[in-house]
Amino acid sequence: MNSRERLITTMNFKEPDRVPFDMGSTQVTGINEQAYRRLRSAYGLPEKEVVYSDQIQGLALPDDDFIEALGIDIRGLFPLNAHNWNVKVTDGGKYWLYLDEWGITHRKPKENGLYFSIYQEPLKNEKLSPDSIKNHPWPNFKDPQRIAGLKELADLYHSKNYGVVMKDPFAGIFEMSQRICGMDYLLMLMASEPDLAGLLFDKMVELKIDFFSSALPVLADSVDVIALMDDYGTQVSQLISPRMFRNQIKPRWKEVFDCIKQYAPNAKRFFHSCGNVRPLIPDFIEIGVQILNPIHVKATGMDPYQLKKDYGDQLVFWGGGVDTQGILPMGTPEEVREDVKRNLDALMPGGGYVFNTVHNIQADVPTENLVAMIETFKEYGVY
């Protein structure tokens, strides 16, 4: 069974020859460039200049030899976006600064900095108004340059029998709105001025539909999975109440998913939402989510055995292979092995599972733990 057959089989809730393996197909299933360099060396691969899938997060785009050496099954398509396109860094004293296409300023410490963090939002607090939303210079997601060459790349990946995932070019309705006006301010608006918050959410929907309605007529037949993201969970609960999600966010996501269904009916719909999103899972299913990521196994309510029991016939689980908060960075190789074995035992029966870490692999993860994860997966991820 080849990689694409393996992915399609598991997404149809059947058991392939082994669990499909993802590392790096999206900007939420990736690996930090420092960890990537060390892992290449551990597998005897030569040094190479790192190409980034996401410069803001410092994520490496895995090279062909790495994909082959580790037995990775899935390749990613990355439309041009603020994290990988025209990233021009300027000197800001102790920081590197980057002004992106949304008008958001990011900064990274020059000394030991690993990531760019948001420093200034363009419509922060009182700057947000109906007029400022209307007049802000929003990015153009109908620009064909955003997907230039992606169909040819996807077809190349398919010719080599890989599964192909295309990522949404910007963060989710809720999360991208936070980046525009500030998280604290948006949360207050949702409670005190939901109509104003709604105008910003509607703009995000408009931009997403601009992208998918122009990109999918070109790419729909060349992708197996379309990946979208919006974080609603914390370690123990949700960032907003389920009622607020259902009233203000859910109907807007349904518009986006309906657009994707219209233009790419055969592609599976992947949705990333960190933390404890257990109360929202039925809502995700209702709007059209078919694949849930990351399966935050150490968050309250996200026990993989219970999730598989309750939703294993409705959702493909993608991720959750090893805890990236504690065990992978701070545990022993044996603890990593046991965690991988447990999560495979919970999630792989009956298909409907793709192996990946709970979230991106960070720079401080010991290489021996990554090797333990990969080799344990290879040993126990077989049907």
What is the meaning of each model-derived region?
Residues M1-R40, L45, E49, Y98-L99, ...:
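Active-site loop segments of alpha/beta catalytic cores
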Residues N2, G58-D65, G93, Q145-A148:
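Generic alpha-helix structural propensity
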Residues N32-L80, N84-W85:
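Segments that shape or occlude catalytic/ligand-binding pockets
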Residues D65-A69, N86-L99, L153-S159:
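Short, charge-rich binding segments
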Residues G76-K88, G93, K142-R146:
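Extended, Lys/Arg-enriched charged tracts that mediate electrostatic binding to polyanionic substrates
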